[in-house]
Amino acid sequence: MELGLSLGDAVTVADGGRLELVLGLGVGVGAGVRRGEEEERGRREDVVGAGRWAAMAAASPEPSVRLSLVSSLGLHWPSETGRSEAAARGFDVNRAPSVAAGAPGMEDDEEGPGAAPALSSSPNDSGGSFPLDLSGHGLRGHAEAAAQGGGGGGGGERSSSRASDDDEGASARKKLRLSKEQSAFLEESFKEHSTLNPKQKVALAKQLNLRPRQVEVWFQNRRARTKLKQTEVDCEYLKRCCETLTEENRRLHKELAELRALKTARPFYMHLPATTLSMCPSCERVASNPATASTSAPAAATSPAAAPTAAARTAVASPEPHRPSSFAALFAAPLGFPLTAAQPRPPPPASNCL
């Protein structure tokens, strides 16, 4: 089954009886070509194509399907020579012209209109064409596929080697599994000294049936865990201290605000001036009596001592007087009232002051 796709050109049949798949794109170029002429030519090409298709169907025993798409859109622009000419470009996928020959054809087509018909790849082309070598692309595609296959084999080898390296690295980085006895012994050793010198490391590795590097890595991890735990404890302590200080600061700010409010507000009490206490006369006498008694007591204590000396001095100085007779003394004594006892003095009235 053969498929023919035609856009503006007729389908051609090769000498071997096979159907050529021709992709033709007819674009009318020219300012003076009218749309009616383009449509008339399209109808003629359709009639010619239908006739050739019927002849091919009668000659070929195999069924075939034909798809014809005729473009009725004409884009016109003036050429370099100033005249209008119709140019149709076709792609012949069954022929194998060289790409190098097609490129000069394009250059000649641009340079002058006379060289274009000579390089036309199809008898139905009127303006010029450029062939496309798909067979070369196919060969090149096969070569690239082969190269990719070879490169894929090399890439597969490289990927396999990389996978083996990754497996080795993973086995080397595999986590160390220790028994309970080994873990307990390492913990006791870590409590005694957290760092090991080379001799201690080798001795501990021999004792636990491990490599020195494994012992060193275990101690490094243990120190890291210890440091991390200590850091967490310190962070918690600092967090609590910060919370306590925050509460204290809030409380102090509150007290300061209250004191400032009391200072700026008007006071509710009045300052009373200092007063003098008055005393009644009786209280003054009572208060003054102890003072006079205390001042007179030393004077009384000193006066008896001085009295004998004065009496002795007067006794020595004055001679003893002549005593009269008792009879003369009796009549010479003056008469007076009889002696009576002294009346006591009434006490002063009590005062009413407190």
From Swiss-Prot:
Residues 148-157 have a biased composition (Gly residues). Residues 229-273 are annotated as: Leucine-zipper. The keyword Aminoacyl-tRNA synthetase does not apply. The keyword Transcription applies. It is found in: Nucleus. Transmembrane segments: none annotated. One of its GO terms (cellular component) is nucleus. Expressed in seedlings, roots, stems, leaf sheaths and blades and panicles. Keywords: DNA-binding, Homeobox, Nucleus, Transcription, Transcription regulation. SMART domains: HALZ, HOX. Probable transcription factor. This is Homeobox-leucine zipper protein HOX27.
